[in-house]
């Protein structure tokens, strides 16, 4: 059973979640694989439309492939919405790469101890070719 947190603890958790999300988005924008992976641990889980990724090595492989696409010239990314409450962050975004149009993407992050413990991703992706 989860204990009730006082307001200061809730604010601290929210601030940590905000910091982790800001770092994650900054590293994603720079296509920085090492920086992105600093947000995950071997206990992290990442739910994608293609299945569950468990641990930092599986998540690293996912981002390595994604970053190959996102580092090509002409990439654009727009963050449409960001909500943070306690240990949970939610974002909605659009992006375009040389290969695909991400008409909408959404991620949810659960942050514990300064790391992303759980992440979900879903999106509507249309190939350009």
Which residue stretches match the model-derived regions?
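Glycine-/small-residue-rich active-site loops that bind phosphorylated ligands and cofactors
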Residues: 51-54, 97
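Short, well-ordered alpha-helical segments enriched in acidic and aromatic residues
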Residues: 30-43
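Solvent-exposed, amphipathic alpha-helical segments
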Residues: 16-27
């Amino acid at each position: 059973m989860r204990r009730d947190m006082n307001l200061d603890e809730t604010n601290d958790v929210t601030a940590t979640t905000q910091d982790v999300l800001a770092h994650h988005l900054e590293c994603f924008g720079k296509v920085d694989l090492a920086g992105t992976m600093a947000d995950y641990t071997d206990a992290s889980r990442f739910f994608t439309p293609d299945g569950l990724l468990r641990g930092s090595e599986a998540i690293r492989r996912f981002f390595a492939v994604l970053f190959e696409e996102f580092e090509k010239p002409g990439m654009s990314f727009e963050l449409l919405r960001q909500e943070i409450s306690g240990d949970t962050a939610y974002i909605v975004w659009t992006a375009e790469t040389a290969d695909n149009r991400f008409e909408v993407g959404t991620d949810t992050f659960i942050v514990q101890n300064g790391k992303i413990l759980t992440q979900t991703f879903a999106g509507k992706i249309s190939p350009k070719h």
